[in-house]
A protein has these predicted regions:
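Short amphipathic helix-loop junctions that connect adjacent transmembrane helices
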Residues: 27-41, 230-246
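A membrane-interface helix-boundary motif in multi-pass transporters
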Residues: 154-167, 357-380
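Multi-pass alpha-helical transporter architecture, strongest
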Residues: 173-179, 376-404
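Helix-to-loop junctions at the C-terminal end of transmembrane segments
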Residues: 58-69, 261-274, 359
Length: 404
């Protein structure tokens, strides 16, 4: 049986490979969809449909992982992701792109399940640091994923990144099948089988006020952030003439900053300042950076705004996940985090669809105003996030025991 450190490393690698596949398509998808005649509104839906389907799938997969174990859910999720990307690669119509995104979304419970896996094997006081390692895997995925996606699209065409992402997901599946042990013991699964349905049972097994607050905060953050990601590639293309390859390198820079903060600094920062204070600071960074982005008058200023976005997200995301995890009983970790990820998925659907509509509105006003309304709307969501962060508890009284 691998040690806890080894298991964390395997989860880190699993999420890293998953996020490389996810990051590969971010700078490419708008341009790939335009080849098939997609409008800005349809591009927004192409980003958003993945998350809309994931919204329904995540809590179900979280409950399945509580009852049958984390490992099989992670394995099936990554196989579904591989199938979705391959369909997007071979498809030559906009409809096939949507089919691939829907299949990928149905398989999109791996992140919440991976977070539950980490919660299974870590003590409550270690959660934010462990979630920071997940955040670092996200960051590394965003270093390599967009860069690989932009480069392969420039060299081999827009369908090539889809095959790369599908291949990486298959590698991920092999890694999980061959190496990753189960973290959720059978006796805990029996408790989950006897427990209540997700609603209202969940609220008997969490500290309701902090959990609801952190989920609402997470929803608002993701909605604002996904508005930005939905328009960013087209924004830098029209404003600064950045192509898919250049945009990929920008996302790689954001990922590098995230890796440095979440991989090497978040644990010490949490001990010194506390989770709720760090979350508040992160929300402030994100809000100001998103508001500033459409006002930038040169590449250097735009890059600085990207740095602010990266810092804010790196402080906010792992601390919110840590608070949510510690507010739930041990045998309900999968469902609590799955529901939180599901609300994030709903926000990731709303964000890009809203971004596409706002982008079309700005286009009617000319390139000079391009993407101003989407970025201001994103900043508005982060203002709400900031206000909600002020209501997060400084600490939780109840600290559920870990499962291992």
């Amino acid at each position: 049986m691998p040690s806890k450190r080894t298991s964390l490393l395997i989860i880190f690698l699993t999420i890293f490979i998953n996020m490389v596949g996810f990051g590969v398509v971010i700078p490419v998808l708008p341009f790939y969809a335009e080849r098939f005649g997609a409008s800005t509104w349809e591009i927004g839906w192409l980003f958003g449909i993945f998350s809309l389907v994931q919204f329904f799938a995540s809590p179900i997969l979280g409950q399945v992982s509580d009852r049958f174990g984390r490992r099989p859910v992670l394995l099936l999720s990554t196989l579904g992701t591989a199938a979705g990307f391959i369909i997007m690669g071979i498809g030559q119509t906009l409809t096939m792109l949507f089919v691939g995104r829907i299949i990928d979304g149905l398989s999109g419970g791996s992140i919440g399940t991976a977070q539950a896996y980490v919660a299974d094997i870590t003590a409550p006081e270690e959660r934010s640091r462990a979630m920071g390692l997940i955040g670092a895997a996200f960051g590394l995925g965003f270093i390599f994923g967009p860069a690989i996606g932009g480069w392969t699209a420039a060299q081999f065409g827009y369908s090539a990144p889809m095959y790369v992402a599908g291949g990486l997901a298959l590698i991920n599946s092999v890694l999980i099948f061959c190496i990753l042990p189960e973290s959720h013991p059978k006796e805990k699964r029996q408790l989950s089988k006897k427990s209540e349905p997700l609603f209202p049972g969940l609220f008997k097994h969490v500290e309701v006020k902090p959990y609801v607050t952190v989920v609402a905060t997470y929803f608002s953050m993701i909605a604002g952030f996904s508005i930005m990601t939905g328009v960013f590639a087209l924004f830098v293309f029209h404003r600064y003439q950045f192509n898919a390859e250049s945009t990929g390198y920008l996302f790689a820079m954001i990922g590098l900053i995230g890796t440095i903060i979440q991989g090497g600094m978040i644990g010490r920062l949490v001990k010194k300042y506390g989770e709720s204070r760090l979350a508040t600071i992160g929300a402030l960074f994100l809000m100001l950076s998103l508001f500033w982005m459409p006002l930038t008058a040169g590449v250097a200023a735009m890059v600085l705004a990207c740095c602010g976005i990266a810092i804010g997200n790196s402080l906010l995301s792992p601390t919110l996940t840590g608070i949510a995890s510690r507010s739930a009983d041990a045998e309900w970790q999968g469902r609590a985090l799955g529901l939180m990820q599901s609300m994030g998925s709903l926000a990731r659907w709303i964000g890009p669809v809203l971004a596409g509509w706002l982008l079309a509105y700005d286009l009617d006003k000319g390139i000079a105003a391009y993407a101003r309304t989407p970025f201001y709307t994103a900043a508005g969501f982060l203002l709400l996030t900031f206000i909600l962060c002020l209501r997060l508890p400084a600490r939780l009284v109840k600290k559920p025991e870990p499962l291992a």
